[in-house]
Design a protein with these regions (language model features):
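Cytosolic-side transmembrane-helix boundaries in multi-pass membrane proteins
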Residues: 1-51, 55, 234, 241-248, ...
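Helix-loop-helix "hairpin" substructures at the membrane interface of multi-pass membrane proteins
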Residues: 117-126, 130-136, 197-275
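Transmembrane alpha-helical segments in multi-pass inner-membrane proteins
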Residues: 261-262, 271-337
């Protein structure tokens, strides 16, 4: 009897200790965490592209050349970050490319026609851009139509308005120059200036790009909104069932894309003083491809802001690397398609490996 009673506590202690041992066994190693990162495939691809052009293109490794690569990457990356967040949330925006042009046209024509300070036009452009983004999100959540249809309609409307209003107001397909208007110099300093570091000139868009990457990563990884984005993209019905504000999340994501389009549009305007109303068509696909190369799933619920930045960097290295290698630039789209296929396959393999190790 005594032996039986004394064995009882030991048995309980052994049972209690068992889960502790299991938890130690199930701890994720740093390698497994690395394999689970969405941007792993794009980082491998970026390193391969960098080494490739470093070997075959004379001058690719020069500081001035790398500055050019970063600038080309930033013009795509500014839009790729919010587009990636939208794709993680399970949606697309086919109007993103022409919205960049729309925001530039609004700033230019409002300032010129109203003889207002350039910053007034910039502010009006921001409000209108955000309203267009909110419209996309509102129509999506209220009609339940696919985002492809909603944003394709917005794309066509913006294309028509860009051309129609520009011809109606300015009489041509381009805006009047606003270089001599009040506030232009300070606005150019914010959106299109050049910063010299160690004798090498870098465009300010690189800083905008890095800031958006940092902001996007913080939202996804450190905030409740980031959890909502992943939840909505993974399973919208399940997210709604646990109290996630699905409609507000999607409207906010579309407004985020509109904000990125506004920044890109102001850079376009203040870089050239005037805007061609037909620009931007087709760029929406480039932003989506950069996000996919960076690890975003077409179906949503998976991806990262850093991955989209790496995808944009691959674009920049390829577009400028072909020039430095003195190849025919017509080959760029071939490389673009090949990178998309390879990156998609590599990202799918990385995701399967990540799922297998968890």
């Amino acid at each position: 009897m005594t032996a039986g009673r004394s064995a009882g506590p030991n048995t309980v202690e052994q049972k209690a200790e068992a889960p502790v041992a299991d938890e130690r066994i199930l701890r994720t190693s740093p390698l497994k965490k690395l394999l689970a990162r969405p941007e792993l495939g794009s980082v491998v691809g970026a390193l391969a592209v960098f080494v490739f052009f470093a070997l075959i293109a004379d001058g690719f490794l020069r500081a001035a050349s790398l500055s050019t690569v970063l600038y080309a990457s930033s013009t795509i990356g500014i839009m790729a970050v919010p587009v990636a967040l939208l794709m993680i949330g399970g949606e697309f925006d086919l109007s993103a490319g022409v919205l960049v042009t729309s925001s530039a046209l609004i700033s230019s024509m409002f300032s010129y026609q109203m003889t207002a300070n350039t910053w007034v036009g910039v502010g009006v452009s921001l409000l209108v851009s955000l309203a267009i983004g909110a419209f996309n999100g509102f129509m999506l959540t209220r009609t339940k139509l696919p985002s492809f249809i909603i944003t394709l309609g917005t794309f066509l409307m913006l294309c028509g308005m860009n051309l129609g209003f520009t011809k109606l107001i300015d009489g041509t397909v381009s805006t009047k120059t606003i270089a001599d208007m009040q506030g232009f110099s300070s606005a150019r300093a914010v959106f299109a200036s050049t910063v010299s570091v160690g004798g090498v000139d870098f465009k300010v868009t690189i800083l905008w790009w890095l800031a958006l990457v940092a902001l996007g990563s913080w939202i996804l990884l450190r905030t409740r909104v980031g959890n909502w984005i992943f939840a909505v993209g993974g399973n919208e019905d399940a997210a709604r069932a646990v109290g996630v504000p699905v409609a507000k999340t999607k409207i906010g994501l579309y407004m985020g894309v509109a904000f990125g389009a506004w920044i890109s549009g102001q850079h376009l305007l203040f870089s050239f003083d005037a805007v061609q109303s037909g620009e931007g068509v087709g760029n929406e696909l480039i932003y989506i491809i950069a996000a996919v190369i960076g690890g975003c799933l077409i179906t949503g619920g998976y991806g990262s802001a850093i991955g989209s930045a790496v995808g944009a960097l691959i674009f920049g290295m390829t577009s400028k690397g072909i020039v430095f290698a003195e190849w025919n630039p017509d080959w760029f789209k071939f490389f673009l398609g090949a990178m998309l296929l390879l990156a998609t396959l590599l990202n799918a393999w990385v995701r399967k490996r990540a799922e297998a190790t968890t």
